[in-house]
Amino acid sequence: MFMERQDRYYQTYLNILKEELVAAMGCTEPIAIAYGAAKAREVLGAVPHKVVLEVSSNIIKNVKSVVVPNTDGLKGIEAATAAGIIAGRSDKILEVIAEVCQAEKQQIKTYLSETDIEVKLADSQIIFDIMITMFHQDSYVKLRIADYHTHIVHIEKNGEIIFGTGDLDAGISSLTDRKLLSVSKIIEFADSVRIEDVKELLDKQIEYNSAIARAGMEGNYGANVGRVLLKTYGNDVKIRAKAMAAAGSDARMSGCELPVIINSGSGNQGMTASLPVIEYAAELQSGEEKLYRALVVSNLITLHLKTGIGRLSAFCGVICAGCGSGAGIAYLHGGGYDEIAHTIVNAAAIVSGIVCDGAKPSCAGKIAAAVDAGILGYLMYKEGQQFRGGDGIVAKGIENTIANIGYLGKVGMKETDKEIINIMLNQCSS
């Protein structure tokens, strides 16, 4: 079927892509802290002498072990806060610390050593919650980000509320409704979308994400998973697809100062959803238009799987993106609904349940595993093999399987998430 431009699904899917495929420089959780800190400092009108942060446990998990870019290798919540205060430009949003000069890098270190920055675990039921209070002389500013990385819900200065209604649900409802996402409609949209409607978005994704993957291959970042794959596994397209996605993560998790186009609020998911598809399109000589349509499939499938799980979870988000890239690769090979649906189910059955233990270099290895599952999921179906309803969390019907994955990630792994965070915090204190 052909989807017309005025169709409700067409406009919804296009809006979702525009909301989600945005640029971010640095791992998005520390960057969200830097963004909030920069905005709060602007409202305060001065560099604070004291800062108190109250953050949800998942923020601690995702900031603890990742390098904050443009800080000369600093890690952690305090470093992200200092970077935002000293060098942040809040109008750049998730590229808030993309432009930091050498003098500012030194000022960040000095500020960290001389300033009281206190971090507390927030007494909050919200998975994504950042509350920043800054003090300068007799003035203070409170700022809160909730639910997703750029959603400022409250700004208060000296007792006066200057922004926000206090309604934490308002930001989520302002996003385009994800309930309309389905595998069949995503494929229909990808077949029908006018290229001019998505070209600018996808050109940036191709350019930015390919650039950081090349940097990961050429530099010495993290555990160099991408380079190890190419050196030890060979140069087949299946290996290159995994290696490029892993190399992008190698670089990003270790502070590479290049932006990426994210997906579901995550750079790792944005790279995993796109780089394997880009690599396969080059190998197959698919052409520009086919690549764009395959990227529409991979990005929207990733978002569809991730929606039920939520922004942050104990369920590793790149698993969703690995399923997405597998779907995009199936599309490049001429696959339709059956091929894509079975690819997703097969891939999800293989790697669902890999835990998220925060942003750090080993994410690159998980990306390699997720992409491998996506490719294997497609190749299994091509060979007439599949996992069937009743095999573990696999249900009859792709949408039922996706719903099971969402339930597992959002509800089933809540206690797992708590124990992962307990382990990580105990490591910090020991």
Curated annotation (Swiss-Prot):
HAMAP family named in the record: UPF0597
Pfam annotation, one family: SDH_alpha
Family: Belongs to the UPF0597 family.
GO molecular function: L-cysteine desulfhydrase activity
InterPro entries: Ser_deHydtase-like_asu, UPF0597
Stated name of the protein: UPF0597 protein DSY1109
Domain of life of the source: Bacteria
An individual GO BP term: L-cysteine catabolic process to pyruvate
PANTHER family: UPF0597 PROTEIN YHAM (PTHR30501:SF2)
